[in-house]
């Protein structure tokens, strides 16, 4: 089964998703068949092929008659500003990855479904009535396949939750604070310019700029036991990619640096392999560019004060790691849904073979259509 994906919004995350799909050779599992982006097709092709952060695309990229051609695949390029106009029916879309950063409500998800998509995954935090907010590696196994409206949380939530969850299971976290040291983003100007947030009127390359963050709320949504137990602040720094997370937690018993690091190292080699990483190499932020993991612990920076106050430095590629998790979640969800569909089909066939009444048979077929 090859999952048919549409991307709505082809910015940093959308392009990273396409690149990750091809770099990881997952085209047999998933295919991006259509991209909705208001930019000119020539610019779309150019920015797919040439990327200042991740380098040149590893395969030829060509543009022909509004088709983005990569390897043997044709990706349709469309330009619609209204969700109601999107051609998902026409392209038989299984999952829409909405990477606009704009939409996130139940009504927005319903608009995608009405346009013909079976499921919607937002690449950013969504409204509280979302069917599920998923941090892959932590709670993705709670999905049933029935969900239609999902959020992939945020890059920073995906970075922090595996670390917090792991340490809580071993040392019982009481509370914590986080400082996100995030690379500049495209909502910041190159030189001073107008913005509703006065701090973001300032040149991205000239200052460390405090910005708002909802990271604490994101952690609470995945790990409800930590309601009102975490606070977070964020600053943007003059780099183009990779984020550092300064995590401080109070645990319920005295611990040592070695115990903390051993716990995280073990997780990186077992249940969170390829999600959480661990290193003691003398690395800097650029060394984590294009790292597909959600978070990487720098064990040399772990500190313990007064026995139970723990500080950690955690890295993540806020583009590449997150894009890989979106693909992981898409594949997992679509396969769950397909398994349910097949089970429903087998049930109806079995009942037909046993001569079940047409009334019950019709009811089961109606349920199958809903699934």
From Swiss-Prot:
Signal peptide: none annotated. GO terms for cellular component: cytoplasm. Disulfide bonds: none annotated. The active site is at 155 (nucleophile). Pfam families: Gp_dh_C, Gp_dh_N. Keywords: Cytoplasm, NAD, Oxidoreductase, Pyridoxine biosynthesis. This is D-erythrose-4-phosphate dehydrogenase. It comes from Psychromonas ingrahamii (strain DSM 17664 / CCUG 51855 / 37). The lineage of its organism: Bacteria, Pseudomonadati, Pseudomonadota, Gammaproteobacteria, Alteromonadales.
């Amino acid at each position: 089964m090859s999952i048919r994906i549409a991307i709505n919004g082809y910015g940093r995350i959308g392009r990273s998703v396409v690149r990750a799909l091809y770099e990881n050779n997952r085209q047999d599992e998933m295919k991006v068949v259509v991209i909705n982006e208001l930019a000119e097709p020539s610019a779309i092709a150019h920015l797919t092929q040439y990327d200042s952060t991740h380098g040149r695309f590893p395969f030829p990229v060509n543009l022909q008659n509004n088709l983005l051609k990569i390897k043997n695949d044709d990706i349709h390029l469309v330009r619609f500003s209204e969700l109601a106009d999107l051609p998902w029916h026409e392209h038989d879309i299984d999952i829409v990855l909405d990477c606009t950063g704009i939409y996130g409500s139940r009504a927005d998800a319903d608009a995608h479904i009405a346009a013909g998509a079976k499921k919607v995954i937002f690449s950013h935090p969504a409204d509280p009535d979302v069917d599920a907010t998923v941090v892959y590696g932590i709670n993705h196994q709670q999905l049933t396949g029935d969900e239609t409206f999902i959020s992939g949380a945020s890059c920073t939530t995906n970075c922090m939750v595996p670390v917090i969850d792991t340490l809580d299971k071993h040392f019982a976290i009481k509370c914590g604070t986080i400082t996100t040291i995030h690379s500049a983003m495209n909502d910041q100007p190159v030189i001073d310019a107008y913005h509703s947030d006065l701090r973001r009127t300032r040149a991205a390359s000239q200052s460390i700029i405090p910005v708002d963050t909802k990271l604490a709320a994101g952690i609470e949504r995945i790990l409800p036991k930590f309601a009102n137990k975490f606070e977070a602040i964020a600053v943007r720094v003059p780099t183009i990619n990779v984020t550092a997370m300064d995590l401080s937690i109070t645990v319920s018993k005295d611990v040592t640096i070695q115990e903390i690091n051993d716990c995280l190292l073990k997780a990186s080699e077992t249940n969170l392999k390829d999600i959480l990483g661990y290193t003691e190499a003398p690395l800097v932020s650029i060394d984590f560019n294009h790292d597909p993991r959600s978070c990487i612990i720098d064990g040399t920076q772990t500190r313990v004060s007064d026995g139970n106050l723990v500080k950690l430095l955690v890295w993540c590629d806020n583009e590449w790691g997150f894009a890989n998790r979106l693909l992981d979640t898409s594949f997992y969800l679509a396969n769950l849904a397909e398994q349910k569909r097949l089970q429903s089909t087998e049930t109806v066939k079995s009942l037909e073979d046993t001569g079940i009444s047409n009334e019950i048979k019709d009811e089961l077929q109606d349920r199958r259509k809903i699934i």
